[in-house]
Each structure stands twice: as structure tokens, then as C-alpha cells.
């Protein structure tokens, strides 16, 4: 699918998404993969990729998920990279049937990843659909932009792991979201939580100081991952090794667990 084109400038009001009823969800894909980001890199996980996102980050590596998808591509069988298609929207019983082959006892998937797009844009659907998914006995791992505070509150009891972004304006090309990130992190704290920061050659020291200070105010033991840019869409210049070393030291002045981890699935040529 070709990258979605937005009529909004970076940092402007949220891009309008197709209205989705609570009993229905817009899902772009369901598939098996090796987690390539964050502190659980290397684990086998089942991914549910939601369609639609309110942001237009310059470094976005999944522009096809920025807008609602016409069809949901379901890997069949899991791990084959062969897909069948079902029409959107996807009702909760359809989702339950789609994930069942991925979550059999011999599938070795450690958790179910909700990714996007922005899964919390469909919080009402998550409240309806996740209980049946959780019944398979796997943890639910939420990947999110870290800004939809009320939506997180509404589904937090159904989530086990929160992997949230912090979005430096000097990386994203958008307006600052620090206040939302701070409140979101506070709400997420009862769960296992990690923070991901995509960094480019233009990422600024003041922005990284904001990340450091917000996380340290909430809990200095929270893991923070500096993720070097994988060239994509509007961002092409990766940070230098010297920058990454300096930035890790800057955050480590107040934080206990700061790591530099690239997108490992991209190195493998995977989804």
C-alpha cells in the first residue's frame, strides 16, 4: 500500500479518522514476528496492527497504518508470510477467531502486541475485544504514542506491558507533547512500562533533557530506549555514534536504565 498523504502540517490538529463503532475495529494486519524494538527485543510475539493515527511523525516507518485500512491482512499460517484478507471493520468474534491459531500452546508466542497506527484511538473496541484475547493466557503488550491518557485509563486493567513513545519535536517535526507524556507515564506506572525515544541527527539536547526529567520525576528506574532512526518517510539522517554515546550519558545522569537499541527487525528484513 502506498504511503498515506496527509493534508495536515506536522503538529497540527489530529488527522480525522473514519468513525468506528465500539463493537467494530479497524485492523490493518495480524501476524507473527520477532520483536525488534525496546527491552523485549528478540521475543516471538503476535502482532495486531491497528489502522489510523493522529500523528504524522517525520520518522514514521509504517505510513500505511496512518489511516484506516480497507482490509485486514491475516497471516495464515502463522510465520509463513502468506496472508488472507478480511474486510474491515473487524468485530470482536472475528478477531478472536483470527488470533486463535497464533496462541495455541505450541505457537511459542510470548505475548500479544497491540501496535499501529495508534491502538488507543480504538479504546472502546479494545474494551470489548481484549477479554477474549486475554483468555488465551498471553500477556498483552501495548505500543502507543503515549498521549491518550483517558483512553489508557479505560483499558489499563486489560494491559500487562506499556511501551510508550516520547516524541521530541526535534525528531518528529511536530509540536511538543511533554504534558501529555508526563500524565500518560504516571497512569501507566502500575504496569510494566518502558519508554522509547526515536532519535535522529537533529534531535536536540533540550528535548532529551525533557525526556530525562519527566521520566526521573515519575520513576528513575523505568527503562528508556534511545532508538536510532531507521531512514524513513521524511527523516533520513541517522545520529552518529558519538551523539548516541553522549545522549545515553545525558539521560543516565538521572535514570538507571538507559539503552541504545536500533530496530532489529529492520536488520533482519522482517515486517
Give names to the regions the model predicted.
Residues 3, 14-31, 256-271:
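Short, basic/aromatic-enriched C-terminal tail that caps enzymatic domains
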Amino acid at each position: 500500500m502506498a504511503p498515506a498523504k496527509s493534508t495536515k502540517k506536522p503538529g497540527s490538529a489530529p488527522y480525522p479518522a473514519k468513525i468506528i463503532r465500539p463493537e467494530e475495529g479497524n485492523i490493518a494486519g495480524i501476524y507473527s514476528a520477532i520483536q525488534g524494538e525496546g527491552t523485549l527485543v528478540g521475543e516471538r510475539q503476535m502482532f495486531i496492527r491497528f489502522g489510523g493515527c493522529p500523528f504524522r511523525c517525520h520518522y514514521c516507518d509504517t505510513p500505511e497504518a496512518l489511516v484506516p485500512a480497507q482490509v485486514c491482512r491475516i497471516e495464515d499460517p502463522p510465520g509463513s508470510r502468506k496472508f488472507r484478507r478480511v474486510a474491515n471493520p473487524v468485530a470482536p468474534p472475528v478477531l478472536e477467531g483470527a488470533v486463535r491459531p497464533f496462541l495455541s500452546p505450541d505457537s511459542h508466542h510470548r505475548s500479544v502486541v497491540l501496535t499501529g497506527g495508534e491502538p488507543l484511538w480504538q479504546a472502546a473496541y479494545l474494551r470489548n475485544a481484549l477479554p477474549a484475547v486475554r483468555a488465551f493466557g498471553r500477556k498483552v503488550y501495548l505500543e502507543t504514542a503515549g498521549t491518550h491518557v483517558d483512553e489508557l485509563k479505560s483499558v489499563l486493567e486489560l494491559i500487562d506491558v506499556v511501551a510508550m513513545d516520547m516524541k521530541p519535536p526535534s525528531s518528529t517535526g511536530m509540536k511538543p507533547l511533554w504534558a501529555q507524556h508526563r500524565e500518560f507515564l504516571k497512569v501507566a506506572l502500575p504496569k510494566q512500562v518502558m519508554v522509547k525515544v526515536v532519535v535522529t541527527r537533529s534531535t536536540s539536547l533540550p528535548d532529551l533533557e525533557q525526556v530525562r526529567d519527566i521520566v526521573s520525576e515519575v520513576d528513575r528506574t523505568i527503562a528508556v530506549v534511545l532508538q536510532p532512526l531507521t531512514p524513513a518517510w521524511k527523516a533520513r539522517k541517522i545520529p552518529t555514534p558519538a551523539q548516541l554515546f553522549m545522549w545515553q550519558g545525558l539521560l543516565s545522569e538521572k535514570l538507571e536504565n538507559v539503552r541504545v537499541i536500533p530496530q532489529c527487525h529492520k536488520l533482519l528484513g522482517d515486517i
